[in-house]
């Protein structure tokens, strides 16, 4: 399985082409639209989300509600493009129109300046448009297809926010997977403690008035993955490493950890390692899950626990100082539309990116020309793991 995305933030559309999806997977536009709507939601989103109503168009690879095994083409139209017809025109335009929305004061924390240097851009909008988080629309669309595969194999997942702009979400007692999932899904903030909703919303409103932004830490949990996915035989086959790369590829993500993560640096080995158990009904298990479901780059059969840290959004309504790329004089950075926070949306993106990596690993590991073939191979493997 592989995919490519294309499109600019204010261009006419965004596109993804996915190759390697088995034939016979039940797939409808509504499956993808559901994830796209989740990405657009959450408290703190800005004006762009009131303009766009993301809906996918499937133009290949699906017929009568089933995948055919051919490449799948997904497209999402950018409604906001109608206001940017001159600025984002494919053909040449008058010089005055070119200068209309030219970006020459790069924003600290964005790809503007370095992208302009790398690709020799006189107008930093050429870097801004593609590096925008709008691109993640299509990674969520691809992830929605991946989640359909995982669901057919009995794999489920969730995400929730652990730290919201410096406020730690308090979890007073251990919640089951289903309890975490339900609470996060019914929260505008993707948090599992409803008593903290108003406190955080008030904080977001305060940050917005100040023209500032906040980040936080997101946790994604995956249930139902058997032991043995990934491999230790080469560095690039380790599944946790693949997930780390994928999570860090999400806009504004600056760190990733598994299980208790960086806290391991403060603990002894006897406190960190997960003791092994075995029962006739369940097979192998672990007393704990400090390592987040991974040993030696492979899944252990425990829930996968992946955490990602998102920096505050770099576009500020009270912009930081920058430099004019023509005169090299100090200037305030360019201001584009922005949100005080996009943590709930980033959680949806992270969840779908993780789903894509897991689906790809499964499709590469098991016979997967058709869904029925994949389901049998996966079921047989589960049975083998249980009786090992």
Curated annotation (Swiss-Prot):
One of its GO terms (biological process) is chorismate biosynthetic process. PROSITE patterns: CHORISMATE_SYNTHASE_1, CHORISMATE_SYNTHASE_2, CHORISMATE_SYNTHASE_3. Its cofactor is FMNH2. SUPFAM superfamilies: Chorismate synthase, AroC. One of its GO terms (molecular function) is FMN binding. One of its GO terms (cellular component) is cytosol. Homotetramer. HAMAP family: Chorismate_synth. Belongs to the chorismate synthase family. This is Chorismate synthase. It comes from Streptococcus pyogenes serotype M28 (strain MGAS6180). The gene is aroC.
